[in-house]
């Protein structure tokens, strides 16, 4: 059965130019699923939520994580609080738009949905 999802937020990927996007650019496309991780050690933003791309190296089987950037500071407080409360599994984050010709802050847009908690 397909999980029910509720639209929560659409935003740009902040800080993209400072992180690992270029290493995996060719693997990213509209619909790519990303992971949201609370970054408690971020000295620039007390509510920092990292956006991470995970892939498995086909040769070694090792899971590799690439920090792509962050949820913008003006958009992250509720997500940060829910992640701190252990609700990381309720979020589905996917790339909704890629524009390589745009300014860094506008190259990647994200759609975040809340996945309904289906009880057995």
Descriptions of predicted regions:
Residues 1-120:
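Conserved active-site motif detector
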